[in-house]
């Protein structure tokens, strides 16, 4: 994954940090099942070995996700990857998987006759994707392979033209017209080969070249039929068979074009044979055999072309899925970055990322992510009158108002070079001067304060509620970073931060309250007046802090600001249209006067921006990326890097082992095709040759063997209808590459035996010997004219000599049958090219031994002699035995080795192409699988990371369905228990000395305390609790925030929080014992309704608001060290559950007057 760019791309196995293990366990990865592409079946039971089960697409989206990629696709806008025929669709069975690939759902309904014919018709039709753009990408995807295949085909055809020219010109005086035709064809093929090799060769040109080749082949076929001497319906039959075969396998054309071309070439030969041999008495027999031969060749072509094309399209779908997974992973990375950087500054996030990616040894303490920064200014701002505003708003309006207001503050902070630290209810604080130091940090904070007061004045004007801002600023040093293991939030700590907080508390509404330290950094650029903060805040009075209130900027500062605004406006105008506009997280569309808020930069034009973003189609993005990847990749380089050149085996043994375990789900269909070829061969043999009981027995035995093999292979798919032993046998064959290859070779061998078996039952007596006896001549002196004199003619089945064996007059059909048996091996796409080459040479060698040296050799010699007799009879001329003309053709038994070599070359080239494609597809699929697994792991990690920032139910809300960017999360909770737990004397413990690294060691101990609290809240018994945040040394948690944790009847979520509070007290005692400290905790508990929500859809921060939260905080601040103070409402619930409580009495609470409170002393006595 090193090639991915992203902030966090960790290996999941290395995420062994404490927070990761406690914040959600990784879901066990489900075993991935190889999903075969279900093609229309050749037989009803020949389904995929393991039919894919459709999985509903699960879409997830967070509000901070990339809008262009996760946008909801409108009707008709999404691109489905389902295959379809040009005329017929697969809509009834297609299922779109989450990765975007279309699969065919298993069809368990009974198949009717029309349904089977419908599926059979689909096999013969061209496949294409519904999207024309996707179809073009697919053609580009395999263009390099097709270009290479077409180039090799041109070379083969040049060789074939040379062979035909040799066969025609060697034995007799050639015909000039046919020689010229073959020469022109050779030249054209050479020219086309050069054209195909050019870099400028384009996809559209490939179709033109393919159809030009078909035209040339038709012309050669016509010329060969006219030039044949002597003429016969079977003369040169192997040539059109070869043309038909390469049309399906080596020409890059669609199925429909291949079927039409194959049938056209076949029909052309049949018409020529019928027209040129109309007077032959045996014409019907040979034409019938030719029809069967061509039908078988076309069937082999279809059985080869269909699965090859489907496999290629499936490979394209998987590769596109890989591209989509990669892009999705990149988007996930960006979303993760956006989410993390919304909570943590980049310098902190990068350090945490490095630690997450690196395995760490066990350490005594958790690592602390703290950095020290000097010369910074801290701004605290609080909304005065927020309680009145909240009381007049619904939950949605409150969250919306805070979201809009703080989003505006975030924009102002960015403009004024301030870093937002945290939002605490209605309090907002930021720092200028970190992570990068700035000399004008005090000016930035003052300008930020001025802008915030202006912004709140607009809220006051629109809502009619008297709200205002108190702003306090102090300059000094801070420690910034993250504490704890859960609910990370970036924060700052130091004495100067504490002082800045009190500056806000002691400030005045609508004014900016600063210290002398900040005033010194302002260099007199602002007019000030005494602030008298000590009169309003005890801490300021105790520390004798001199404070000031900003009156306004000096004249010099006003001039500088005016010049700066002018420069910024000029720069903005020059960059208009190049930079994206700021889009708020939500417009004030539901407030009283949205026009006023346009002055804040929030207007309806943001909707147009969102619409422009939504217009970006993620499918188009994937297709565009795929197009660039197709243009950039090099198939030759992939082969060179991963595959051995001749053997086509992987260079890495582990890849070869994985590939050897690859299962072809269409293996049963391959065996069924072999059975079909066998049946065609039987028809040819029965039509042309005499047959005996022995041959019928052999054919019946072969048929039964092949049929049983087909049925055994089908058992694996047909399920529980068969015995377990038979099912195990079927699985052992189909799911093992070695076993299925052995069965495939065995099937081809049976077909080959059926092609040559009849040769041994024919008469093997030489005709020359018989004629020599009758004419009292030596066999070498016998010519065709002598045979004509004694009425020996072609086509007689009766024995010509003594004996009972019948005569086989047309051995060319033995050659044709053997060629069909060899072509049947091309159907088994899973057999390696070397395996097919060896098998072809072995079978061809056996056949040639029989042909040249065995008894069947006389059959071919007799045929050549009788064919010459037939030629003499056709010429109607009379010759005597002395001046008999020589035969004008090469003997069939000498032509056969060359024919076999040509077919073997074509078979090997096709096998190489299929295996090379399959192996490269396997590489891509392996990458796709790895990327999908990594994506799943990263998604699980993202989910844990998300849960570490937002509560699980909130995260689930955003992940449940796709949402618009302006939708907010808000929830009114009727009965929530809230806890504030603070270390009362931590401020006394915290000192900034050189001995403790300016206070860092104090924060290290605080980090350990918070980490202990996080570990406790992660325990199963406290699953109803949710950590909200930490505020300095105060820990905030709540329970009952969602339906799964809210117990309306038993109120168990309330007792769980009480138990947790007591558990924290015990843990603090344990910490004091081991750290030799005397920390004192004060804990306040309250219950009641709250409003929960996420502030800032782009920079999310979960929080809860309401009177319940404020009172709970007061229970903490007015509490007693080492005691847990609760309200009357909580007392009533806990007392009913048997908890031990005591009445403290009446306590004065700020904003609430006097309240009766209680101390929680222990749990139920039982």
Swiss-Prot record:
- Give me any GO biological process, just one: cellular response to forskolin
> Which cofactor does this sequence's record say it needs?
Mg(2+); Mn(2+)
Indicate how the chain sits in the lipid bilayer: Multi-pass membrane protein
Q: What does UniProt list under activity regulation?
A: Activated by G(s) G alpha protein GNAS. Inhibited by G(i) G alpha protein GNAI1. Is further activated by the complex formed by GNB1 and GNG2. Activated by forskolin. Inhibited by calcium ions, already at micromolar concentrations. Inhibited by adenosine, AMP and their analogs. Phosphorylation by RAF1 results in its activation.
Hey, what tissues is this thing expressed in?
Detected in brain and kidney. Detected in vascular smooth muscle cells.
Binding of Mg(2+) 1, residues = 382, 426
**What does the record say about PTM?**
Phosphorylation by RAF1 increases enzyme activity. Phosphorylation by PKA on Ser-660 inhibits the GNAS-mediated increase in catalytic activity. Phosphorylation by PKC on Ser-554, Ser-660 and Thr-917 inhibits catalytic activity.
Q: Which residues lie on this side of the membrane: Extracellular?
A: 758-817
Keyword set includes Zinc = no
**Quick one: which residues bind ATP?**
382-387, 424-426, 470, 1029, 1103-1105, 1110-1114, 1150
- Which residues does this entry mark as bearing Phosphothreonine? 917
Q: What is the effect of changing residue 917 to A?
A: Reduces phosphorylation by PKC, abolishes PKC-mediated inhibition
- Report the co-factor binding details: Binds 2 magnesium ions per subunit. Is also active with manganese (in vitro).
A Pfam family? Adcy_cons_dom
Enzyme superclass (EC): lyase
State the GO CC annotations.
cilium; endosome; membrane; microvillus membrane; plasma membrane; sarcolemma; stereocilium
Phosphoserine carried by residues: 53, 554, 574, 660
Per UniProt, the keywords (alphabetical) are: ATP-binding, cAMP biosynthesis, Cell membrane, Cell projection, Cilium, Glycoprotein, Lyase, Magnesium, Manganese, Membrane, Metal-binding, Nucleotide-binding, Phosphoprotein, Repeat, Transmembrane, Transmembrane helix
Q: What is its EC number?
A: 4.6.1.1
Task: Tell me its family.
Answer: Belongs to the adenylyl cyclase class-4/guanylyl cyclase family.
Q: Show the domain comment.
A: The protein contains two modules with six transmembrane helices each; both are required for catalytic activity. Isolated N-terminal or C-terminal guanylate cyclase domains have no catalytic activity, but when they are brought together, enzyme activity is restored. The active site is at the interface of the two domains. Both contribute substrate-binding residues, but the catalytic metal ions are bound exclusively via the N-terminal guanylate cyclase domain.
Q: What is this protein called?
A: Adenylate cyclase type 6
Origin species: Rattus norvegicus
């Amino acid at each position: 994954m090193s090639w991915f760019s992203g902030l966090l791309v960790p290996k999941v196995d290395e995420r062994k940090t404490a927070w990761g293990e406690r914040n959600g366990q990784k879901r066990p990865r489900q075993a991935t099942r190889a999903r075969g592409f279900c093609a229309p079946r050749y037989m009803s039971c020949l389904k995929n070995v393991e039919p894919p089960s459709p999985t509903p697409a699960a879409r997830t989206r967070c509000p901070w996700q990339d809008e262009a990629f996760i946008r909801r696709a409108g009707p008709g806008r999404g691109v489905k990857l389902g295959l379809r025929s040009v005329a017929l669709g697969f809509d009834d069975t297609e299922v779109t998987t989450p990765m975007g690939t279309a699969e065919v759902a298993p069809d368990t309904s009974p198949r009717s006759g029309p349904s089977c014919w419908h599926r059979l018709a689909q096999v013969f039709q061209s496949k294409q994707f519904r999207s024309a753009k996707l179809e073009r990408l697919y053609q580009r995807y395999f263009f390099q392979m097709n270009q290479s295949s077409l180039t090799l085909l041109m070379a083969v055809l040049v060789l074939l033209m040379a062979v035909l020219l040799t066969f025609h010109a060697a034995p007799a005086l050639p015909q000039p017209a046919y020689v010229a035709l073959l020469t022109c064809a050779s030249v054209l093929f050479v020219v086309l080969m050069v054209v195909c090799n050019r870099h400028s060769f384009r996809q559209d040109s490939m179709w033109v070249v393919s159809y030009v080749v078909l035209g040339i082949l038709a012309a050669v076929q016509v010329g060969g039929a006219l030039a044949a001497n002597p003429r016969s319906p079977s003369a040169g039959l192997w040539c059109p068979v070869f043309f038909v075969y390469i049309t399906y396998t080596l020409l890059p054309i669609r199925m429909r074009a291949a079927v039409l071309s194959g049938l056209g070439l076949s029909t052309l030969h049949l018409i020529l044979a019928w027209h040129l041999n109309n007077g032959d008495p045996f014409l019907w027999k040979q034409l019938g055999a030719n029809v069967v031969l061509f039908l078988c060749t076309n069937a082999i072509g279809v059985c080869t072309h269909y699965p090859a094309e489907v496999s290629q399209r499936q490979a394209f779908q998987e590769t596109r899925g890989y591209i989509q997974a990669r892009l999705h992973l990149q988007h996930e990375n960006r979303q993760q970055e956006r989410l993390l950087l919304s909570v943590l500054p980049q310098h902190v996030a990068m350090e945490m990322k490095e630690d997450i990616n690196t395995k760490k040894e066990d350490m005594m303490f958790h690592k602390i992510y703290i950095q020290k920064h000097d010369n910074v200014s801290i701004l605290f701002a609080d909304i005065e009158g927020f309680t009145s505003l909240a009381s007049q708003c619904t939950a949605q309006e409150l969250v919306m108002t805070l979201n809009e207001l703080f989003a505006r503050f975030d924009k102002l902070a960015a403009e004024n070079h301030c870093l937002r630290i945290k939002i605490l209810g209605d309090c907002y604080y930021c720092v200028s001067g970190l992570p990068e130091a700035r000399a004008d940090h005090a000016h930035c904070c003052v300008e930020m304060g001025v802008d915030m007061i202006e912004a709140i004045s607009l809220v006051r004007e629109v809502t009619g509620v008297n709200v205002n801002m108190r702003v306090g600023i102090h300059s000094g040093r801070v420690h910034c970073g993250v504490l704890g293991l859960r609910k990370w939030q970036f924060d700052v700590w130091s004495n100067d931060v504490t002082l800045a907080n009190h500056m806000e508390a002691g400030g005045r509404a609508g004014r900016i309250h600063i210290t002398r330290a900040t005033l010194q950094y302002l260099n007199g650029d602002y007019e000030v007046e005494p602030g008298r903060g000590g009169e309003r805040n005890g801490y300021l009075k105790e520390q004798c802090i001199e404070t000031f209130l900003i009156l306004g900027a000096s004249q010099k500062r006003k001039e500088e600001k005016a010049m700066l605004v002018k420069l910024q406006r000029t720069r903005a105008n020059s960059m208009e249209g190049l930079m994206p506009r700021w889009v708020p997280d939500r417009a004030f569309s539901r407030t009283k006067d949205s026009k006023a808020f346009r002055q804040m930069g929030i207007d309806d034009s943001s909707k147009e921006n969102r619409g422009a973003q939504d217009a970006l189609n993620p499918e188009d993005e994937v297709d565009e990326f795929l197009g660039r990847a197709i243009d950039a990749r090099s198939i030759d380089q992939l082969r060179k890097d991963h595959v051995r050149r001749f053997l086509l085996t992987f260079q890495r043994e582990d890849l070869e082992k994985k590939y050897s375990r690859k299962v072809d789900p269409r293996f049963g269909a391959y065996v069924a095709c072999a059975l079909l070829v066998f049946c065609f061969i039987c028809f040819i043999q029965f039509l042309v040759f005499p047959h005996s009981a022995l041959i019928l027995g052999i054919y019946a035995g072969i048929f039964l063997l092949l049929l049983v093999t087909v049925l055994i292979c089908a058992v694996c798919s047909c399920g529980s209808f068969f015995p377990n032993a038979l099912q195990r046998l079927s699985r052992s064959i189909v799911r093992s590459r070695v076993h299925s290859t052995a069965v495939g070779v065995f099937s081809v061998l049976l077909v080959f035996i059926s092609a040559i078996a009849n040769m041994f039952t024919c008469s093997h007596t030489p005709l020359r010997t018989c004629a020599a006896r009758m004419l009292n001549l030596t066999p070498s002196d016998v010519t065709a004219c002598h045979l004509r004199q004694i009425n020996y003619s072609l086509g007689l089945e009766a024995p010509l000599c003594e004996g009972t064996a019948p005569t086989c007059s047309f051995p060319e059909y033995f050659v044709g049958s053997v060629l069909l048996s060899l072509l049947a091996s091309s159907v088994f796409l899973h057999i390696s090219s070397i395996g097919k080459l060896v098998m072809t040479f072995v079978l061809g060698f056996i056949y040639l031994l029989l042909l040249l040296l065995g008894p069947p050799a006389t059959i071919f010699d007799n045929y050549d002699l009788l064919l010459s007799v037939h030629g003499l009879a056709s010429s109607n001329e009379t010759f005597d035995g002395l001046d008999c003309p020589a035969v004008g053709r090469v003997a069939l038994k000498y032509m056969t080795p060359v024919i076999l070599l040509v077919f073997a070359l074509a078979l090997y080239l096709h096998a190489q192409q299929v295996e090379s494609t399959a192996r490269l597809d396997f590489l891509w699929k392996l990458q796709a699988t790895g990327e999908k697994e990594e994506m799943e792991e990263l998604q699980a990690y993202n989910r844990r990371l998300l849960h570490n920032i937002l509560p699980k139910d909130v995260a689930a809300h955003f992940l449940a369905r796709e949402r618009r960017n302006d939708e907010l999360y808000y929830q009114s909770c009727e009965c929530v228990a809230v806890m504030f737990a603070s270390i009362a004397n931590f401020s006394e413990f915290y000192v900034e000395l050189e001995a403790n690294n300016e206070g860092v060691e104090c924060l290290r101990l605080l980090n350990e305390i918070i980490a202990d609290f996080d570990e406790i809240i992660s325990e199963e018994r406290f699953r109803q609790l949710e950590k909200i945040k930490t505020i300095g040394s105060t820990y905030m948690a709540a329970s009952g925030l969602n339906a799964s944790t809210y117990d309306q009847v038993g109120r168990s979520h309330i007792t769980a929080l009480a138990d947790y509070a007591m558990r924290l007290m015990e843990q603090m005692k344990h910490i004091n014992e081991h750290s030799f400290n005397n920390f004192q905790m004060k804990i306040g508990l309250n219950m009641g309704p709250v409003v929960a929500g996420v502030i800032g859809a782009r920079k999310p921060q979960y929080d809860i608001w309401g009177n319940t939260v404020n009172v709970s905080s007061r229970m903490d601040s007015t509490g007693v060290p080492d005691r847990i103070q609760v309200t009357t409402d909580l007392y009533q619930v806990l007392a009913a559950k048997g908890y031990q409580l005591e009445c403290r009495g009446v306590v004065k609470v700020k904003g609430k007057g006097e309240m009766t409170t209680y101390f929680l002393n222990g749990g139920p006595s039982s």
